[in-house]
Regions:
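Modules that initiate DNA replication and primer synthesis
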Residues: 1-104, 166-167, 471-477, 524-528, ...
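ASCE RecA-like P-loop NTPase motor cores
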Residues: 102-577
């Protein structure tokens, strides 16, 4: 009854003696009679001091309640209540007070603005950030398809100072470069992608070896040295020459530059002195990423004669660790000849040695790699950025956060929350996969990478960020993209959490004005990291349909609620039309 008092305004008005309409009292009586001891509670409130002077005291409510119970009248739907628009109700009064395990309850209704108002707010926030001379990290959060790309492309046409646009992938980089040309932006270039130059696999794989051990700074030098020892008649000679020339020319380019998030973090410092920086989408998971090495491979490296004693001592110390640890700083500079000898390890040795946060068990060591974020003004446009996370990992940087008001989707989302739809739920559950394949047969599917072939798709969590190929199409997003618990733990440590033994357990939580069950943590920082990562991956997947401007449908099968969805806690064979 306490829950009902908190979430049902009709019941609240009844307890406070504020109901004037007898019909509302009867509606409430039918609802309360559906609960254990509901009749007793109703009469207790009816005969309370606050209802003593009400006109409906003359009615024989005891007789009415007995008739409701005897006739087995159903609990009425909240949709038929006069208070319907004043609360975040569930199916009926009882489920509102005590929702089922798989039910998503909306605690506060979103107030939407029209699309033009939301778009104009984005324009204003962006122009304010670009006009500022302060060295701040400007985080502008706006819905997918609100017009973020066109906003900065229009700015670039007349900007006095050139800009660097950083996007998540090479594919999106090419799309933005193409769109910029269509906008009439001429003084512009894109950083090169070695995969498009046709250089032989022998060379590119050898170069990749250096990236794999964390010696990316040496990779281009290796390529230049390879060119010096290569005959001009070699088919790779002209291709490598052109690639190196393009790398050098783009780094010195005085016009606009389109690049990837990863490449941005390794551009020469001089670029940030002459260019403004715009981040298209959140760069957090490029700055911070996790990698693992098996304990067996680690122990093997400690016996390598090509590594200095200081490095082997550090690795031996890591082998003895168990659980989460914050490591002391360790400076590592290996000689060129050593790099060539250890490049076949296939382990990010530099990343491991420099890692401040690690987790070790008997099988493997997982570590957090952190790239340096350039010390200059940056303007980020993202649908999923988390202000609190940036404030925690960059406490000494000035951060300006703006969230644009939301517009209502033109398209529709139907979300099935009858199961968590976790990776574990799909393991060897061919019946479930078969059912979902049938339900998703007329849509394009985004799901886990390891089961995408089951749905005849090449779209999976982690590779759809920013793409436009699915615009206006009916989609099915299948799965709850939970990451390994160790990943959450390492991110949380970087955000200031002090971890001992922490475990997930099923619990009802509140997130973005919704109440729902999730297998999550009691620790607030861990929960913040997990919910942000889940939300951002699901919203990125849903956002590919561009529902804000496109009248299409997205069907979501996941136990974590996405925005503006109709939540359905029972899976039916026929999808909602």
């Amino acid at each position: 009854w306490e829950n009902l008092y908190d979430c049902c305004p009709l019941y609240w008005d009844f307890t406070e003696g504020r109901i004037e309409n007898t019909q509302d009292i009867y509606f409430l009586a039918r609802g309360m009679c559906g609960a254990e001891k509901g009749k007793q509670k109703f009469l207790e409130i009816m005969h309370s001091e606050k209802n003593a002077e009400q006109h409906y005291q003359n009615i024989n409510w005891k007789e009415i309640l007995t008739a409701i119970i005897k006739d087995n009248l159903p609990v009425p739907s909240c949709e038929n209540c006069d208070y319907c628009d004043r609360c975040s109700h569930s199916e009926n009064m009882l489920s509102t007070a005590k929702p089922t395990r798989r039910e998503v309850r909306i605690l506060k209704r979103e107030r939407y603005v029209d699309l033009e108002t939301a778009h104009q707010d984005l324009q204003n926030a962006f122009q304010t950030a670009m006009a500022s001379a302060e060295n701040k990290l400007y985080l502008i959060k706006g819905q997918t398809a609100l017009g973020k790309t066109s906003t900065y492309l229009n700015y670039m046409k007349d900007s006095v100072r050139p800009v660097v646009i950083a996007v998540p992938t090479h594919e999106l980089k090419r799309q933005i470069f193409y769109d910029a040309n269509l906008h009439g932006i001429e003084a512009i270039c894109a950083t090169p992608d070695i995969a498009t130059y046709g250089i032989s696999e022998d060379v590119t794989e050898e170069m990749q070896d250096f990236y794999d051990i964390g010696a990316g700074a040496y990779a281009l030098r290796f390529l230049a040295e390879t060119l010096q020892h290569m005959g001009k008649d070699n088919p790779d000679y002209a291709k490598i020459s052109r690639f190196l020339k393009d790398c050098k020319s783009t780094a010195r380019f005085q016009g606009h530059i389109i690049t990837t998030h990863a490449k941005l973090l390794h551009l020469p410092k001089e670029v940030f002195q002459t260019h403004d920086v715009i981040l298209d989408e959140d760069i957090f998971r490029t700055i911070f990423r996790t990698e693992s090495v098996s304990m067996q491979a680690l122990k093997k490296m400690t016996g390598s004669r090509y590594l200095p004693d200081s490095v082997k001592s550090r690795l031996n110390g890591i082998c003895l660790k168990r659980g989460y640890h914050q490591m002391d700083e360790f400076a590592v500079e290996l000689e060129e000849k050593q790099l060539r000898k250890i490049r076949h390890f296939g382990v990010n040795l530099y990343g491991l040695l420099r890692a401040k946060y690690i987790h070790a068990d008997r099988e493997r060591v997982t570590f957090l790699i952190e790239e340096s974020l350039p010390d200059c003004k940056m303007v980020m446009l993202s649908a999923t950025v988390c202000r609190e996370l940036y404030q925690r990992v960059y406490p000494n940087r000035a951060i300006d956060f703006h969230e644009c008001p939301k517009a209502e989707y033109k398209g529709h989302i139907f979300q099935y929350t009858d199961s968590s739809y976790s990776r574990y739920a799909f393991q060897n559950n061919y019946d479930k996969i078969r059912l979902l394949k049938e339900l998703c047969r007329d849509t394009t599917v985004i799901t886990f990478k390891d089961i995408e072939k089951e749905f005849i798709t090449h779209y999976h969590f982690g590779n759809v960020e920013g793409i436009n190929a699915l615009k206006g199409k009916d989609l099915s997003v299948v799965g709850l993209p939970n990451l390994d618990e160790v990943v959450y733990g390492l991110y949380a440590m970087r955000a200031g959490a002090s971890l001992a033994k922490v475990h997930m357990y099923p619990q009802r939580i509140t997130y973005q004005n919704k109440s729902f069950f999730l297998n999550t943590y009691k620790d607030e920082t861990l929960r913040m990291v997990q919910t942000w990562l889940l939300s951002s991956q699901l919203e990125q997947a849903v956002g590919r349909a561009r529902l804000l401007r496109e009248d299409c449908r997205v069907f979501v099968y996941a136990g974590f609620p996405v925005e503006q969805a109709k939540y359905i806690d029972r899976l039916c064979v026929q999808k909602t039309e």
